[in-house]
Design a protein with these regions (language model features):
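Intrinsically disordered, low-complexity segments enriched in small residues
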Residues: 3-24, 160-178, 201-245
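Short, surface-exposed, charge-dense and proline/glycine-enriched linear segments
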Residues: 54-60, 114-118, 233-245
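Conserved phosphate- and dinucleotide-binding cores of soluble alpha/beta proteins
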Residues: 59-215
């Protein structure tokens, strides 16, 4: 049986995480969490250990003081990868978690920045993730900068955007040019479709390709071990996703 759209996203996230030693995942992030769990399972088969810190999970989180420890650990350089989203994301990697329109009269209002600015500055591999891929989300310029994708020359910064994964495509971020580069397009979509649904300009990789399907072994891991582990923090997501197989 072929992979569902969400299973393909989980496999894509795991691929983006290849090479990390410690990945942290914030709240309300089932697909990034599943991708991190898949990365751990795949690396274990290669004899390599990956540490996970899944906020909201009792079994897959070594923090005892929640987000306070997350920020301390990140500031000490002990987290290799983290995920951020945004109500708006622009072509320079800036994210808006506050609201649309002129602040402080933004409408709608979103949950808030929650320390995203710090994590964006210090975590080397920040992966931006949004299932929705539309001009409403991917705008030319965000209305409010919760966390800046780039900094001025001379500003010491160890972290920043590394990749963008959406329901339609995968991009990498070119920090030197401050632009996203389209590297993969998910099946049943094309380049024109991506351009129509993206409100900012982007480059295309020379080796632009269709997102590969997860192989049988990877798909079995997702549907077995990964979903079993994910159910600790996201039981409803697992039930719904397994029901669509």
């Amino acid at each position: 049986m072929s992979a569902s759209d969400r299973e393909r996203l989980i496999a894509t996230v795991a691929d983006v995480l290849d090479g990390v030693g410690h990945v942290a995942v914030g709240a309300s992030s089932p697909i990034p969490a599943a991708g991190a769990m898949l990365r751990r399972a795949l690396d274990e088969r290669r004899g390599r250990a990956v540490r996970l810190s899944i906020l909201g999970s009792a079994r897959h989180n070594f923090f005892t003081n929640g987000s306070a420890e997350l920020f301390d650990c990140a500031a000490q350089g002990r987290i290799d990868a983290f995920f951020l989203g945004g109500g708006q994301i622009d072509g320079e990697g800036n994210i808006n978690l506050v609201g649309a329109g002129d602040y402080p009269r933004s409408s709608p209002r979103w949950p808030g920045s929650f320390g995203s600015g710090l994590l964006y500055y210090v975590v080397p591999r920040v992966i931006l993730f949004r299932e929705e891929h539309s001009p409403r989300v991917f705008v030319d310029k965000v209305d409010f900068v919760s966390a800046a994708g780039t900094s001025a020359p001379g500003v010491h910064r160890t972290g920043g955007p590394y990749a963008l994964v959406t329901g339609l495509a995968r991009f990498r971020f070119d920090r030197a040019r401050r632009r996203f580069v389209l590297s993969e397009i998910h099946p049943e979509h094309g380049l024109d479709d991506i351009r129509d649904r993206t409100g900012f300009e982007f480059d295309c990789a020379e080796d632009l390709r269709a997102t590969p399907e997860p192989d049988k072994e990877t798909l079995a891991l997702i549907r077995g071990r990964v979903f079993d582990e994910l159910a600790d923090a996201y039981p409803q997501f697992v039930e719904t996703t397994r029901g669509s197989e």
